[in-house]
């Protein structure tokens, strides 16, 4: 049978493995109370008071107990999904959870109860107006947050901080659209009417607010995605030592033997709440060793995908001919920072040198062995990422949000151009406003394709 958004669904809502508590969640969809009450009777042997915790046995089809725990019944619309929902909180062993799940499926076979798909409970919450799309995505972002700052920002998005900003923009665009489109109906008055209502001034304020929202969203995207930083360079220049220094732990083997690192070593660290995904790679050189050559090929693949490349050099030799060959292969669109390591052997103080001319690279002089200059390097990485100190109060945002905000920004810029031409382009002015509104509505899901919804919710865990 084809799954639909109105089917009754069930899933284990807690993570796999053993724990003190495990939760099985049922959302009854079109079955409503007519399905919920018989299932509650079958599993719990008694009626449950709505929104009250009841300590009951969970029984099989013969009345024998499978477990004892807390049962919670939430009649619609006062539930997570907006439908009638039952939650069974039992002991968190995988066998117990599977027994409860199968018992629900068996008892609910008569009204079409099926296993939930990934993210289907949250999808129901979105479809039933319990959450908008940005808030629904924040549920997954909160679960997946890799830093405290990311978790707090996801919580703000879930609370509606991002959505409120978008809704305010949409309301302002709608108000301006109404003004412009009403003016189109009275062409003999269009110039005086628009000027009297200060249409261009209103548009300028909308664009200013959108730029502010986009700036905050960029900061939120950094909190969510972080920065991929690849350590690259010749063998034995201290890449593994730098990874260990940045991470504050001995993660990579460090020896004076060239070619010790043959495959990547990755570690995520936090700097001001931003996850930095540091990747130590095989030293770049010509070699006949087949295993090392595979590692070097993987290094170049990582460099192609990097957000930032740290090109490590030995400060005793500086930029050699071999280093020039390596630098020439770096992809043009990836920022590169030249890191001169081993200043403990040269006596050069740790420092950051920003480029004096276009085309030059930032240079960081440091000692990974002693830790000199490591904080300077962290600060430089945050600067490249565009992180603003104190921005941890922003909401979390995704790449699709940034794309929509930039598209709306472009449409509003086009609208401003048409507004300057007055009557000759008034219909185009109105159309650009409509397109900007459409992009903003896509963020909260008021205008969203079914295909996009499928992609978003398929990335959730089952049971959420």
UniProtKB/Swiss-Prot annotation:
Locate the residues binding GTP: 236-241, 255-261, 280-283
> What is this protein's gene name?
mnmE
What are the subcellular locations of this protein? Answer: Cytoplasm
Q: Which UniProt keywords apply?
A: Cytoplasm, GTP-binding, Hydrolase, Magnesium, Metal-binding, Nucleotide-binding, Potassium, tRNA processing
* Species classification: Bacteria, Pseudomonadati, Pseudomonadota, Betaproteobacteria, Burkholderiales
Q: Which organism is it from?
A: Burkholderia ambifaria (strain ATCC BAA-244 / DSM 16087 / CCUG 44356 / LMG 19182 / AMMD)
Q: Where does (6S)-5-formyl-5,6,7,8-tetrahydrofolate bind?
A: 25, 87, 130, 464
Q: Does the keyword Hydrolase apply?
A: yes
Protein's GO biological process: tRNA methylation; tRNA wobble uridine modification
Q: From the UniProt record, which GO molecular function terms apply?
A: GTP binding; GTPase activity; metal ion binding
Cofactor-binding details, from the entry: Binds 1 potassium ion per subunit.
Q: Which SUPFAM superfamilies match?
A: P-loop containing nucleoside triphosphate hydrolases, TrmE connector domain
* Gene3D superfamilies hit by this protein: P-loop containing nucleotide triphosphate hydrolases, Probable tRNA modification gtpase trme, domain 1, tRNA modification GTPase MnmE domain 2
Record function comment: Exhibits a very high intrinsic GTPase hydrolysis rate. Involved in the addition of a carboxymethylaminomethyl (cmnm) group at the wobble position (U34) of certain tRNAs, forming tRNA-cmnm(5)s(2)U34.
List, separated by semicolons, the cofactors it needs.
K(+)
Complexes and interactors = Homodimer. Heterotetramer of two MnmE and two MnmG subunits.
Which Enzyme Commission number(s) are listed? 3.6.-.-
Q: Where is the TrmE-type G domain?
A: 226-386
> What name does UniProt use for this protein?
tRNA modification GTPase MnmE
